[in-house]
């Protein structure tokens, strides 16, 4: 039996900020090859400590700058003929055997932000400049919070479908067996519409007594989101997730978890274990599902419907 037409929908890559690597993976003078958005990139840290990202291939004869290239000052040097490209502008700054540099000797530079332990780049299908900023997480690096735990995994599905899961409270009960799903209030949107914020509440019983727990989830485009939980007075937990398209239907998800030090750090360990199990549960669905362009929603799918409308702004 032939599949319906909307079962073959291939979503493009949405515009936004995406992490290309962890900051700790990029030491001074280090060069990395990265493949994301269906493109080959070179990521490197200049001698002054700046993270830079350029298209991977030299404008001369097409050598891959990330395979044997090296950092020279604020430039990256091609391994083939030693052409040097400025990390910020992508313009060829030096050809060692030629005094006059051709005007077309350049490679595309990517907008970079290094924050929260990640190196982010701005992706836009039409190469337009960024229209919002990467948030700064005050908890990361705060002496009152634990050293962040890190976790990453590749997922064979489009980035939109991963993010959509967060707006689907029913699946938490069916797929993950969670009986204490939070009561979700309305989803709020920033003035420009780029940030969505969900607030939920439930009650948890602990050895220290019963506590009303509040969850706040903020999504900054499709590429990143934060989850903050507040329950025990004076204590908190932060989960930051970054989802980056490698190809349209292959995504790498990275998570960072930190808790206040007045909580036993086992809380962070338990949260990470639950997160890993949750992803494994979802993977059984994700590996075999199709993307419905026009899904049939029922009355209780309110947040899913709102999400589908919200994400439209991130596509050209």
PLM regions and their residue ranges:
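Rieske [2Fe-2S] iron-sulfur-binding domain
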Residues: 5, 19-140
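Charged, low-complexity, helix/coiled-coil-prone segments
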Residues: 1-2, 20-24, 100-116, 211-231, ...
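Sequence-level motif detector for i,i+2 pairs with an aromatic at +2
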Residues: 15-17, 29, 116, 146-150, ...
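C-terminal catalytic domain of Rieske-type non-heme iron oxygenases
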Residues: 50, 127-316
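A short, structural micro-pattern
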Residues: 14, 106, 113-115, 237, ...
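Hydrophobic, proline/glycine-rich low-complexity stretches
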Residues: 1-16
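A general structural signal for short secondary-structure junctions and capping/turn motifs
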Residues: 9-10, 33, 111-113, 243-244, ...
């Amino acid at each position: 039996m032939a599949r319906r037409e909307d079962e073959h929908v291939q979503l493009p890559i949405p515009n936004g900020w995406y992490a290309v690597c962890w900051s700790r993976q990029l030491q001074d003078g280090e060069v990395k090859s990265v493949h994301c958005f269906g493109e080959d990139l070179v990521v490197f840290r200049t001698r002054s400590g700046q993270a830079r990202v350029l298209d991977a291939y030299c404008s001369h004869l097409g050598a891959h700058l990330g395979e044997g290239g090296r950092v020279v000052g604020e430039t990256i040097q091609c391994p083939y003929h030693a052409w040097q490209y400025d990390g910020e502008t992508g313009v060829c700054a030096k050809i060692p055997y030629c005094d006059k540099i051709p005007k077309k000797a350049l490679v595309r530079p990517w907008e970079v932000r290094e924050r929260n332990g990640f190196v982010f780049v701005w992706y836009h299908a039409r190469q337009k400049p960024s229209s919002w900023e990467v948030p700064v997480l005050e908890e990361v690096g705060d002496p009152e919070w634990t050293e962040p735990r890190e976790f990453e995994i590749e997922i064979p599905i489009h980035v939109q479908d991963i993010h959509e899961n967060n707006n689907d409270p029913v699946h938490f009960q069916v797929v993950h067996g969670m009986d204490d799903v939070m009561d979700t209030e309305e989803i709020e949107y920033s003035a420009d519409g780029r940030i969505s914020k969900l607030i939920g509440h439930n009650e948890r019983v602990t050895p220290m007594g019963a506590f009303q727990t509040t969850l706040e989830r903020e999504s900054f485009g499709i590429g990143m989101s934060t989850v903050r939980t507040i329950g025990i007075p004076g204590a908190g937990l932060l989960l930051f997730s970054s989802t980056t398209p490698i190809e349209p239907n292959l995504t790498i998800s990275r998570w960072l978890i930190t808790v206040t030090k007045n909580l036993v750090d086992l809380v962070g360990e338990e949260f990470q274990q639950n997160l890993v199990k949750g992803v494994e549960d979802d993977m059984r669905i994700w590996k075999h599902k199709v993307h419905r362009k026009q899904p049939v929603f029922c009355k209780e799918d309110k947040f899913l419907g709102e999400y589908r409308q919200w994400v439209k702004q991130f596509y050209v």
